[in-house]
Amino acid sequence: MIKIVFSNLLFMFAFLPANIILYFLARNFKVKNIILIIFSLVFYSWGEPVFVALLIFSSFIGYIFAMQIHKSETEQQKKMYLIISLIINIGLLGIFKYTGFFVNNLNALLPIDLPVPNISLPIGISFYTFQIVSYVADVYCNRVKAQESFPKFLMYVS
């Protein structure tokens, strides 16, 4: 499988031009946004297609909890939604980035021999996780209004 990066010839001379051409041929912003979302998700799927579901799931969690924070009337409710969102999104990041490290250290510290899982790292997981976390925190702190459109939020994240 070809790895696609920004400096890859396939990206520069096929993927990017197709994205730009379709974007500028689109007549309205809704269609333009859909084109950008599709191309972003295709780009993310190039490494491992199954991880696009993780990106969409993480985005959906951020979107739902930001909306709940925005609609909540009490500070206690807002804080609860913020914490749940952080636990889920940072928890997913931790599972993918640090499970092997954690198991290796347990094996070194304790007289056990746990199998070290071979977990692939999703492309951009740190970037989009912190993008989501910062957005939800900004909604919590009233720095930004919660985005009411999931496609617009997904475009922001991806």
Kindly give the residue locations of the regions a language model identified:
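Membrane-embedded transmembrane alpha-helical bundles that form the catalytic cores
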Residues: M1-S158
